[in-house]
Regions:
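Short catalytic/metal-binding and nucleic-acid-binding patches
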Residues: 1-200
Length: 200
């Protein structure tokens, strides 16, 4: 059974995992990596910071430093992001004529959501503790542990997508190592002088 934990704080650094429904390789199938970066851009526009990430073929790990959300729950922000990315991924799947995949995603929508107009279940609806759904990062040591975990993902186990962490395109590993990468992030050490409790 999946478990959802409500977050009652409105700022801080969080480790977030978002998983595609039934672990389908939807980012890869749709070439939807850009949809994640669009969401990251949206978060930045609201004053939040992307501190580390990896986009795997079927899931995302990301460290997000939330600046004071002014009463908007972090759960809601993550939920909005999932909806935003879902629309983009479904659009891309339609463009690629992935009829079978779309049918499988449609079959996963429960009756209640279907009545509300939902047509595809792109992401797992809840956060599973064993997947480390989200945990608040309270120290640099903990953040480092999570960054190491994030950056090692493409080299780990059955994935074996690259030999070296910095070789994986859709990750902040290269940015931490060289200061360059496909997407600009804010290193966690740069956050030390930023008061996340203050709104933008």
């Amino acid at each position: 059974m999946s478990v959802r934990r409500e977050i009652h704080e409105y700022d801080g650094i969080y480790f977030v995992t978002i998983t595609c429904s039934q672990w389908f390789h939807l980012f890869e199938l749709s070439n939807g990596y850009d949809e994640v970066y669009k969401w990251f851009d949206h978060l930045k526009s609201k004053g939040h910071f992307i501190t580390g990430y990896v986009i795997m073929p079927n899931h995302i790990h990301v460290l997000i430093a939330f600046r004071n959300t002014q009463g908007v729950s972090i759960n809601s922000i993550i939920g909005e992001g999932k909806r935003f990315m879902s629309y983009g991924i479904v659009r891309r799947l339609k463009e690629k004529n992935e009829v079978e995949v779309l049918a499988r995603l449609s079959a996963l929508v429960n009756a209640t959501d279907r009545k509300r107009g939902k047509r595809h279940e792109v992401f797992e609806p809840s956060f599973v503790p064993m997947a480390i759904g989200r945990k608040e990062c309270k120290s640099n040591k903990f953040i480092n542990q999570k960054l190491n975990y994030i950056h090692a993902n493409p080299c780990r186990g059955a994935w074996d997508l690259v030999t070296e962490e910095i070789e994986y395109t859709y990750s902040s590993a290269k940015y931490y190592e060289t200061g360059e990468g496909i997407y600009v992030i804010t290193k966690y050490t740069e956050l030390e002088d930023i008061d996340l409790t203050k709104a933008l």
